[in-house]
């Protein structure tokens, strides 16, 4: 029993150390977002991430745009007296030519490029088995899922933020369309939110 406790304690310590090594990312106050809309006492704000400095602050060396993924940071501020249910949240980008693009779940991004092909490099000694190269998909980086929007409930007077990911390039004149916010107690859906996505 004592060895199991020691192993558990060691794994928790290592997890905390790994978390400390990860760079911090703060979305900033909702007032700093370039696009905002308030319905009742709920405000939704959005910021598209295409600038190198913004991407580096959020994703480190990984630039999702290089892999055809557009990250959009969304913040929801609930200043109402009701808890909001976010489980049915639906987020889309509407392009200037009116195409609707649904957000891709963060957990699915690592599979977009398909399984990596083994690199059958011949071994250094003839007759030996070739070495397999184990190339990791760049979109499997912890920042993708770790910084995704994950809130399912939002208590009164609180806010939640995170990224939604779209398989698209940024196009000026695009808009973010968000539906599915409900009052948890009544199930009543809030009015939709539609925000411009301008690169600012």
Regions found by a protein language model. Give the residues of each.
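Conserved functional micro-motifs across diverse proteins
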Residues: 16-200
